[in-house]
């Protein structure tokens, strides 16, 4: 129970480096690279005195720590007279900045600050500097000079004594204790009153304001009439409407980007006509087609009057047939850019006014293909059809509407039969320059050079874009003049908006395809190459992968079907494991040990590959239990709370009573630390089974499967936590009664077990809860299907939450939820690791585990979490622990969950492929980056603590105070928190782990398999997926804010999580868009290719994944069933879940006797009386127990189990009543 030492630790850093305190040692500056913290005095990091009640604990856990910041400010350092010069703040690393409440390691730093050794963020040995120069007499904390009494020096009742002129903590008088206890209630009430004041004065958040604005049409009095009298209900409903409005906005944005963005930026479908394809209802003027189908020309020469009195239609009624021709010369652009370039010739008949001319070319129509030859004649009079009158010009420019642009492709422009070039996007025809009548107008010589195909100037621009050429050569005016007089069309190009729309389309397509392709490819890479590194080399099952997969598929067909092979059967790879399994070395006739070898096992040579570190294997001298008296020399792993008597020595261990009694006679002995039956060092594991209302058959099969796993019983213990005294629907007994019937060899008779208090995860009076601890061994029962010779002896502990005496008359006494059950274990592990004050329940858990396992709970490194309706394959636990041991960076993992009732109904059938794809595609992809975002609570594993940095240092993972503090949050007042903590607590724990340790890994181990039953009724599925979908959304909202996940920008887990969040929110709209695209593609031609290709890839890749990775071809059928049910998965379930955002009930997933629907998130009434909960350190509980046992308080003879002789040496006291029974097991306490 220490941080950060491991078992087998050597002398403390201060002892190994005694010169550090010597005067001859040179004082070095406090460089920021030397340690993770500014040096502080030893007194600032000493524990405060323990208190007896929870009220005093929450009032002032440690006055010194609260008053002294972890990182002093610059002003504090500056005023120190003997402090060296400090570097500027800009050079301080981020991990050394001030730690506020929003920091992911805030609570860990606060707890670690109370340790005698500060945590190191660099992995180096922590450096303890005594700034003030004051020292204290006696050995430093954590040294090997502690005795086996289990009592700290400052906790031993004794007189005050001086150390370096400073008075140490002395025992409080009885009167002082009574005065403190009477003031507890007043202090707590005063603190609550002060906490309410800032809450009332706090302004509403922007989110609450938005929700109030969006629901202005529903005032409170109307909502009260509609069945929402509570303020919390109304607030949740308003937040639900706010969330739904945001989801609708996101759906609208996605729909706009899918269908409306192109229309908005590119405009409507503009009619564009290809040259030589303009029909006879149009006439072309200056590159633009005009529809003259219903027009009438005024009566003039050559244009007769029709019978209806109107003029003729020029495209149909005239014999010339102007339809489809180019009539640009009939409405010439004169006196514009060409003014000064084209002038009137001498003796010209062209009307003019100064430099202004009436026309430049003969006013004739031309064929659009450019085949017309120049014609200088006029049919009726000179200037016929030139339309020079103001009325004609006004009618043309103002009354005729442009119908379409005439465009040329680059193939048309490069056609050798034409003389075309491009300037500024316009197509210009140089052949039209031959239509100038030189008798009427004068043109520049440059015109003649450019129109001649044999001229070099023409060859330089013909068939090309000559914009840059004209700009650079100074012929810009000539080019602009050409735009006025010889323009025949435009280049086939898109507008800027259309180009932008295409860019957005293809970028989005590439992004989506890259994400889909990357997920598929990396999932395959994980399945083929990475996942096998996590598996154990050998287990009790067959080593043939195909055969094993077939056995798993057969085993998962029925929830009660036994596994194909049990540990110890013939053919098992670990059956009959001999002593050769202790090491991986080959047998040799040469001796492998000498007189210098340790008694705990052969030392590993430096040439050999370093083995993974576990609590048992990291030091061969680590305490491993009662198998030998040699293990009783030291307790390096638990210096903080087991070896706390400063008067003891290592050479003369104190023999005394064990932890609240004796270690069980039938405890499973601990093997040597180098015993590796599976090819990796063993790690001690707690198998947590949370039970609620399960029946006898379900509990039996689950506990049988956990007990029969092939992992050694010496390194696993079953911990069952019953969430209240609940009787399942149709059951004759309550769930705790069924569980207790599955135990035997109790350490304490069942009828003598007392209930102990603890702080529950609830509000109001429900925050105080009581539970009973039962410790013993698993009983397979007389009717067990497991052969007697295969029944293993597995230690087992049961925690039954029975509730306070006031709850006994109510329904479901003791029930606080699954999260509370998990917190019981997590909080216990934290208290054990940090040696903090614990409740009576945690003290009994500590002693119970020690009694049935023979080792301290501090040795446990891993927690397996299994629901009571889940059955585990025999070698799954081994594979999961193998991954944990082989890669210390893994902090959490999960296995594959198989469905046992596949064929019960269509509801269960549509879930088979969904389960498969969520594991082998989603989790496999996330495992490549070590960022699995959802470890299902029914079958997952977490690391309690991990080795870190230098030898003998461990850091808490699941036992981290930040994880425990946030996961045990009992103030659940917002819709977001309620969806996180009340509906998806398992997923929120995964999110907390990733948020607290973004650089560590959470992976999927496909070799670990379990089976469970899924809902076979649609209403139950609807209720379950409502909880899961809402929990997923709110957890992804938490994870998307974690910036330290691997990758950067679009190539990061944060971006993938963001895409997954948006995809979850728009699921109903996405499936609707999919059906729309498919229907439109069938009706309209040509079909939309890109959306169909994208849809085909998204739906087709899972089929390829099945062919490559599936263990059975039946999954192809399950995939087809899943595709048919896509409207249910993507529309019905998400839409229902969104509308039920404010529903925090658990629905019909599990029913209890006499209950209609389970509730969650109930606002409990009453006040929490914290004075009923006693909190002390383990050593203090143990001291009190021994004092009560010996009927004497404060005597050293009774506390330490020894007496002081005349020579001043402490010797062992006479043995107690049970001394002979546990003398061989007990080392120190």
Swiss-Prot record:
<comment type="similarity">
    <text>Belongs to the chitin synthase family. Class IV subfamily.</text>
</comment>
<feature type="transmembrane region" description="Helical">
    <location>
        <begin position="1055"/>
        <end position="1075"/>
    </location>
</feature>
<feature type="glycosylation site" description="N-linked (GlcNAc...) asparagine">
    <location>
        <position position="608"/>
    </location>
</feature>
<feature type="glycosylation site" description="N-linked (GlcNAc...) asparagine">
    <location>
        <position position="635"/>
    </location>
</feature>
<dbReference type="GO" id="GO:0030428">
    <property type="term" value="C:cell septum"/>
</dbReference>
<feature type="compositionally biased region" description="Basic and acidic residues">
    <location>
        <begin position="92"/>
        <end position="105"/>
    </location>
</feature>
<keyword id="KW-0325">Glycoprotein</keyword>
<keyword id="KW-0812">Transmembrane</keyword>
<dbReference type="GO" id="GO:0005628">
    <property type="term" value="C:prospore membrane"/>
</dbReference>
<dbReference type="Pfam" id="PF03142">
    <property type="entry name" value="Chitin_synth_2"/>
</dbReference>
<feature type="topological domain" description="Cytoplasmic">
    <location>
        <begin position="1"/>
        <end position="202"/>
    </location>
</feature>
<feature type="compositionally biased region" description="Low complexity">
    <location>
        <begin position="137"/>
        <end position="150"/>
    </location>
</feature>
<dbReference type="Pfam" id="PF22997">
    <property type="entry name" value="CHS4"/>
</dbReference>
<feature type="region of interest" description="Disordered">
    <location>
        <begin position="539"/>
        <end position="589"/>
    </location>
</feature>
<keyword id="KW-0472">Membrane</keyword>
<dbReference type="GO" id="GO:0000131">
    <property type="term" value="C:incipient cellular bud site"/>
</dbReference>
<feature type="compositionally biased region" description="Basic and acidic residues">
    <location>
        <begin position="187"/>
        <end position="196"/>
    </location>
</feature>
<feature type="glycosylation site" description="N-linked (GlcNAc...) asparagine">
    <location>
        <position position="1030"/>
    </location>
</feature>
<feature type="topological domain" description="Cytoplasmic">
    <location>
        <begin position="1076"/>
        <end position="1088"/>
    </location>
</feature>
<feature type="topological domain" description="Extracellular">
    <location>
        <begin position="517"/>
        <end position="1054"/>
    </location>
</feature>
<keyword id="KW-0808">Transferase</keyword>
<keyword id="KW-1133">Transmembrane helix</keyword>
<dbReference type="GO" id="GO:0097271">
    <property type="term" value="P:protein localization to bud neck"/>
</dbReference>
<feature type="compositionally biased region" description="Low complexity">
    <location>
        <begin position="568"/>
        <end position="581"/>
    </location>
</feature>
<dbReference type="GO" id="GO:0030476">
    <property type="term" value="P:ascospore wall assembly"/>
</dbReference>
<feature type="region of interest" description="Disordered">
    <location>
        <begin position="1"/>
        <end position="196"/>
    </location>
</feature>
<feature type="transmembrane region" description="Helical">
    <location>
        <begin position="496"/>
        <end position="516"/>
    </location>
</feature>
<dbReference type="GO" id="GO:0045009">
    <property type="term" value="C:chitosome"/>
</dbReference>
<keyword id="KW-0328">Glycosyltransferase</keyword>
<feature type="topological domain" description="Cytoplasmic">
    <location>
        <begin position="262"/>
        <end position="495"/>
    </location>
</feature>
<feature type="topological domain" description="Extracellular">
    <location>
        <begin position="1110"/>
        <end position="1114"/>
    </location>
</feature>
<feature type="region of interest" description="Disordered">
    <location>
        <begin position="601"/>
        <end position="648"/>
    </location>
</feature>
<feature type="transmembrane region" description="Helical">
    <location>
        <begin position="241"/>
        <end position="261"/>
    </location>
</feature>
<keyword id="KW-1003">Cell membrane</keyword>
<feature type="compositionally biased region" description="Polar residues">
    <location>
        <begin position="43"/>
        <end position="66"/>
    </location>
</feature>
<dbReference type="GO" id="GO:0006031">
    <property type="term" value="P:chitin biosynthetic process"/>
</dbReference>
<feature type="compositionally biased region" description="Basic residues">
    <location>
        <begin position="18"/>
        <end position="27"/>
    </location>
</feature>
<dbReference type="InterPro" id="IPR054295">
    <property type="entry name" value="CHS4-like_dom"/>
</dbReference>
<comment type="function">
    <text>Polymerizes chitin, a structural polymer of the cell wall and septum, by transferring the sugar moiety of UDP-GlcNAc to the non-reducing end of the growing chitin polymer. Might function as a negative regulator on expression of other CHS genes.</text>
</comment>
<feature type="transmembrane region" description="Helical">
    <location>
        <begin position="1115"/>
        <end position="1135"/>
    </location>
</feature>
<dbReference type="InterPro" id="IPR001199">
    <property type="entry name" value="Cyt_B5-like_heme/steroid-bd"/>
</dbReference>
<feature type="region of interest" description="Disordered">
    <location>
        <begin position="1210"/>
        <end position="1229"/>
    </location>
</feature>
